[in-house]
Amino acid sequence: MASEARGDKLWGGRFSGSTDPIMEKLNSSIAYDQRLSEVDIQGSMAYAKALEKAGILTKTELEKILSGLEKISEEWSKGVFVVKQSDEDIHTANERRLKELIGDIAGKLHTGRSRNDQVVTDLKLFMKNSLSIISTHLLQLIKTLVERAAIEIDVILPGYTHLQKAQPIRWSQFLLSHAVALTRDSERLGEVKKRINVLPLGSGALAGNPLDIDREMLRSELEFASISLNSMDAISERDFVVEFLSFATLLMIHLSKMAEDLIIYSTSEFGFLTLSDAFSTGSSLMPQKKNPDSLELIRSKAGRVFGRLASILMVLKGLPSTYNKDLQEDKEAVFDVVDTLTAVLQVATGVISTLQISKENMEKALTPEMLATDLALYLVRKGVPFRQAHTASGKAVHLAETKGITINKLSLEDLKSISPQFSSDVSQVFNFVNSVEQYTALAGTAKSSVTTQIEQLRELMKKQKEQA
């Protein structure tokens, strides 16, 4: 009875005793890796063709295997595939079903192939597809930020450092600051995709494939860019998983920052913007509440992604060479982060595209003290060394505070008492449009500079879209 219990395992021949039920539960991954069903079939079809070319399968056998795999694919797509208790993973499930459909010929499919090279191939195929979708959503978010910046380029609001009012900026400059960060994420994603695009299939358990399998044929069939150089490395390396999770971590840092900014700006204390009802929720007790749950969830999901990266790093750091069962942990991390990014990016795009800004409240929040730097720059343009100009401007701020007035209300005599370089044209300093318009250097908040940023980002997005 014990040996029969092992007979349905791909590895059961060597064992005489049955597996402990608790061990069965711990060992099984079919509950989540069935998401690999389609790519597992895709890989098996390619491998079957390579076996036929190598003379392991006859043409008739190949046709039966391909037909059976197509039937299994159809069952998965229709949601009628029946997973059995003995199916410990997606590879076992598909092979078991193939045998039910075409008989013992199914047993030839795994010739020279190990689940070690099979599973990493499946995961890479899954990630190739998923990362293309994520890339599309990411570029759409960047585009939404850029196009909104172009439309609302004339809106000016306070810029903050340390959450204290600092200098006037354009609302567009704020939007583009987040767009630029996301373009770096898009570039990083492109690099991850390059590393994923290396074929491991044909590496066997660790020593390679002894059956003269045409790996170039496999590469072409599965649309990989290149072939792995070393079989031991190919079946065990999960650098691409770590790189993907690292990319995701940085992306979520940027999205969390943007979410936090927008949450603050949406408070009644700031009143700079209002979120759409479509991306807000209410309170079960307080009828007046409109909560920015969409942004709060984006912010919180960052911690979830960070945890996935940390867990995989901990799994990998102590492993010896080649495959170890520890690597089974990679799939849940990848699936979870793929799902998280897919949802978060779409919600973020929805938030940005539908929020309403209050130009009036933004402009009301601008205060003369924010022009203290401009006052110092006024003196610099008069030939005063910056350190002296900075000190003079600070004294002007202090004098205004002492008098209980704003800095722009200081008389010319007051200013001259601080520096003789002040003259009647100093009044031009106390204008918020003039303030932002002086930052004409590349990357600045002047309208001309912001327009250049928009043009550059549009061009960059075009290139990244072509490479996606």
From Swiss-Prot:
Outcome, altering residue 296 to D: Loss of activity
SUPFAM superfamilies to which the protein is assigned, alphabetical: L-aspartase-like
Mutagenesis or variant effect for residue 291 to L: Loss of activity
Pathway: Amino-acid biosynthesis; L-arginine biosynthesis; L-arginine from L-ornithine and carbamoyl phosphate: step 3/3
Stated consequence of mutating residue 325 to N: 99% decrease in catalytic efficiency
CDD domains per the UniProt record, alphabetical: Argininosuccinate_lyase
Effect of residue 116 to D: 99% decrease in catalytic efficiency
Molecular function terms from GO: argininosuccinate lyase activity; structural constituent of eye lens
Organs and tissues of expression: Eye lens.
Annotated effect of mutating residue 283 to H: Loss of activity
Keyword vocabulary terms for this entry: Amino-acid biosynthesis, Arginine biosynthesis, Eye lens protein, Lyase
InterPro entries given in the database record: Arg_succ_lyase_C, Argininosuccinate_lyase, Fumarase/histidase_N, Fumarate_lyase_CS, Fumarate_lyase_fam, Fumarate_lyase_N, L-Aspartase-like
Active site: 162 (proton acceptor), 283 (proton donor)
Entry GO CC: cytosol
EC class: lyase
Consequence the record notes for mutating residue 281 to V: 80% decrease in catalytic efficiency
Outcome reported for the amino acid change (mutating residue 33 to N): 99% decrease in catalytic efficiency
HAMAP family the record matches: Arg_succ_lyase
Oligomeric and partner information: Homotetramer.
Record's miscellaneous remark: Each of the four substrate-binding sites present in the homotetrameric assembly are shared between three of the four subunits.
Chain's role: Delta crystallin, the principal crystallin in embryonic lens, is found only in birds and reptiles. This protein also functions as an enzymatically active argininosuccinate lyase.
Family of this protein: Belongs to the lyase 1 family. Argininosuccinate lyase subfamily.
Protein's recorded name: Argininosuccinate lyase
Lineage: Eukaryota, Metazoa, Chordata, Craniata, Vertebrata
Gene: ASL2
